[in-house]
Each structure stands twice: as structure tokens, then as C-alpha cells.
Regions:
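Glycine-rich adenosine-cofactor-binding loop
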Residues: 2-14
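N-terminal Rossmann-like NAD(P) cofactor-binding module of classical short-chain dehydrogenase/reductase
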Residues: 49-50
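Rossmann-fold NAD(P)-binding glycine/threonine-rich loop
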Residues: 76-98
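Conserved small/polar residues in nucleotide/adenosyl-binding loops
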Residues: 103-105
């Protein structure tokens, strides 16, 4: 599996480590410094995006992945007031979103 990690803080770095230990590949690491790279061109060949950012960034990050045709797993909390909107958008675009509100590693 080739993953994109969106949010390279403590959780993002831990997920990266686990993925690599299990033989998966990291195709992109997106954080504040290169957020403009969250588009279809930079996500080409990615199987899944793992999104662990901030509530303010999560909605746009998830939408960008859906627009790029990349399934998303998000563990960012604090943005679920827009979850229904994203569910509708996923259905409309044929996208996939798996949201987890509490993750322990």
C-alpha cells in the first residue's frame, strides 16, 4: 500500500513509522509547509490518505483528497459539525471517507 500522510505531527510521524515497519510505502507527506501539494498531481499513485491535522484544516484536506480520487482515513477531531456535508460530498463524487474520533497507538 502506498499512503499519503497529511499532518506530520506526533500522530503522523508515528503512523509513518508503523506503515514503514509493516512494509508499506509513503508516497507523500503533507503538512503546513507544503499544503499546496495536496492535489491530484501530487497524490498520483496514492492508495489511501491518512489525515491527522487540525480541525480548521481537516475539512479542506479531506475534500482535496476526495477530489483527487483518494480514499481518506481521518483521525482529526473537532470538525464534525461538517461531517454530514462531507458524507454528501463523498457520495456525490464517489469518494470514500473513514472517520475515527479516537485513536490510540
Amino acid at each position: 500500500m502506498k499512503a499519503a500522510i497529511i499532518g506530520h505531527g506526533k500522530m503522523g510521524r508515528e503512523i509513518e513509522k508503523i506503515l514503514l515497519e509493516r512494509g508499506h510505502r509513503i508516497g507523500a507527506v503533507i503538512d503546513e509547509a507544503n499544503a499546496s501539494e495536496l492535489d491530484a498531481a501530487h497524490l498520483a499513485g496514492i492508495d489511501v490518505a491518512l489525515e491527522f491535522t487540525t480541525p480548521d484544516a481537516a475539512y479542506g484536506n479531506i475534500r482535496a483528497c476526495i477530489d483527487a480520487g483518494i480514499p481518506v482515513v481521518s483521525g482529526t477531531t473537532g470538525w464534525t459539525n461538517r461531517l454530514e456535508e462531507l458524507r454528501s460530498y463523498c457520495r456525490e463524487k464517489g469518494g470514500a471517507l473513514f472517520y475515527l474520533s479516537l485513536i490510540h497507538i
